[in-house]
Amino acid sequence: MDVIGRQHLRQMWDDLAEVYDKKTALIFESAQGKVRQFSYSELNEEINRAANLFHACGIKKGDHVALHLDNCPEFFFCWFGLAKIGAVMVPINARFMYEESAWIINHCQAHFVVTSDNFSPIYQPMLHDKHSPLTQLFLITENCLPTEQGVVDFLSEKAKHPVTLNHHTPLSVDDTAEILFTSGTTSQPKGVVITHYNLRFAGYYSSWQNALREDDIYLTVMPAFHIDCQCTASLPAFSVGATFVLLEKYSARAFWKQILKYQATVTECIPMMMRTLMAQPVSPDEKQHKLREVMFYLNLADEEKDAFIERFNVRLLTSYGMTETIVGLIGDRPGDKRRWPSIGRPGFCYQAQIRDKQNQQVPNGVVGEICVKGEPGKTLFKEYYNRPDATEKALEPDGWLHTGDYGYQDDEGFFYFVDRSCNMIKRGGENVSCIEIENIIASHPKIQDVAVIGVPDDIRDEAIKAFVVLVDGETLSEEAFFAFCEQNMAKFKVPSAVEFKQGLPRNCSGKVIKKHLQ
């Protein structure tokens, strides 16, 4: 079934500009509070200018162009400008340093990078490294640039180009539009190949999931280089002609005020955001919002969810997905009952099953791997870039994707997430979920954040170690910590060791990078 009508991203933006014209498409607020705003026609013009600049600089269909940027409007100018000429965007995590960024540049052979003053020191050495594929740097800067070979002043050069597209490269919805590298919390990142069809479908699917309308205002602070901001927030908002509000940085003190300021009707919160928002002083007007949906994601304890709903008077919508699924393919459906801790049911164009280690479907109620079915290159990712081995391992020929996540299904077709397979601890013959233990520990009033890992144990396969961050100003002894655990969980789940830390290493989507914990 062709859901998108063979419409690639260039056609999408030309149509949106014609249909919605002067309606506000994008509002951006910087960390300093500076606001920039673009209508649909203005945004399309900026996209065309960027496309013309890239084409004039020799970028052609199929070329890989890396974007290393914080949240900013220019990310969207470049993303869709590259798509309009058939080039491939490679977004780089804004937290990455030289080694991580260089690995991606080399792995995907990106000859071009768009970046800002903040990150240009990462790429200047690559320009002069004969072993690096990088040949040109587009620098977004307000400063006057000295003449330097290989460096282009993006803003001033873009302004010289017309607002109509100069070059119409033949495009197909099956063309690659993006290579998005996974977060690599447990291993080296893999490049997820995403097509024009994938991105157009994401807009339709996620707008259906949120029942978005053109009068909606969707606000997010998720990073633009992440699949969530792209496919769960911006594309669905644009696809229905809604207004998309992008914040540069998350501030627990400012976020709810921004919800009120922009009269947001839809937003999203990861657990870290919810916990820090709950730690803020109560404001008398915090319930005077216009939110009808708050998208939220694992991992959140029942008590935390209920407390957040009660305090802010909001309705939470959960969904489950990963970069490879493009969208939250399992989730709460529009008009459907919500049954937390269930992660919901599959949406249209998808199937889901729970399978055992022999790849056989298991009965309802039995924990196994969550496997999902879609169409590669359309409703699922196309492949891993230059990794046919990894693609074959994860993706079956008939479209079944092995997620590596454990869960189960009930008799009414609702799915429940248990944990990542790599997040299960084998302890004395028992399989122990890190998330289950983390949720219990997180319910302690003095604990702000927690992560649990398995460490080698000569007797019981693995021992359990907890890393704990306390609420500012609080103290907690090891004895009190273990006593709390013993009172609230089975003995075999009680951690053998605890380490108190000032903070936990997290990636852009809030997931703890457990390979950095020992």
UniProtKB/Swiss-Prot annotation:
BP term (GO), one: carnitine metabolic process
MF terms (GO), sorted A to Z: acid-thiol ligase activity; carnitine-CoA ligase activity; crotonobetaine-CoA ligase activity
Name the record gives this protein: Crotonobetaine/carnitine--CoA ligase
Phylogenetic classification of the source organism: Bacteria, Pseudomonadati, Pseudomonadota, Gammaproteobacteria, Enterobacterales
Highest taxon listed in the record's lineage: Bacteria
UniProt pathway annotation: Amine and polyamine metabolism; carnitine metabolism
PANTHER family: LONG-CHAIN-FATTY-ACID--COA LIGASE, NONRIBOSOMAL PEPTIDE SYNTHASE PES1 (EUROFUNG)-RELATED
Reactions it catalyzes: 4-(trimethylamino)butanoate + ATP + CoA = 4-(trimethylamino)butanoyl-CoA + AMP + diphosphate; crotonobetaine + ATP + CoA = crotonobetainyl-CoA + AMP + diphosphate; (R)-carnitine + ATP + CoA = (R)-carnitinyl-CoA + AMP + diphosphate
Protein source organism: Proteus mirabilis (strain HI4320)
Role noted for this protein: Catalyzes the transfer of CoA to carnitine, generating the initial carnitinyl-CoA needed for the CaiB reaction cycle. Also has activity toward crotonobetaine and gamma-butyrobetaine.
InterPro entries documented for this protein: AMP-bd_C, AMP-bd_C_sf, AMP-binding_CS, AMP-dep_synth/lig_dom, ANL_N_sf, ATP-dep_AMP-bd_enzyme, CaiC
Keywords of the record: Ligase
Enzyme class, broadest EC rank: ligase
